[in-house]
Amino acid sequence: MPNFKVAAALAVAGVMALSGCKIIKTPTAEEAAEAASGGFNPNRMVAEIWDTKVLSYLDRKAGPFTEVAALAGSDPQAAGAKYGHKEKQGSAPWTFAARLSGTIVKAETKSRSAYVEVDADADGKADARVQIGPAIRGTAIRDSLDFVNFNEFKNQIEWAQFGKAFNTHVNGLVLEKLPRDGLVGKKLDAVGAYPLPAKGQLARLTVGG
């Protein structure tokens, strides 16, 4: 008895071969965006360096927050040389790597730009504001790293997207898992980065780990 399934399959294959027909995979939204941007994928770039370079750098560079803040307040250049980084071009401020440990004294969790304020020196007053997302302001993690720089990117748009990708990565890896209730009075330990704040303003820490 003839095998009609095989015969039909061969006939279809023959038609496809003769007509030059081929099946093309539909790209995902991310793949389509990457193709449209010439292969630039900031989220993938951040993921590839996060464990191997970013975490080890922050762990090595970060000082105790109270020490970093005290030195930055009296001598920003000295604090920057020891704990910080800034782009050589332009007038970018220092961004410092710090290890913050303390007690949460205030929590704002209703906003998308949620944060907690932390007392790091046990005086009952807030010393730093820690962003807990999902919306994270600034690009402190990118700006604290001495192994990435603007000249490696095509333009300011790519550089900005790269900075935002760090925030997206941190949010998915760490911040989404944090509880949102009953935070006041809890202890917090975090390593991250923050730009030199304006006088009288709290340091705004972006968590790295």
Please place each PLM-identified region on the residue numbering.
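OB-fold and OB-like single-stranded nucleic-acid-recognition modules
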Residues: K5, G20-G209
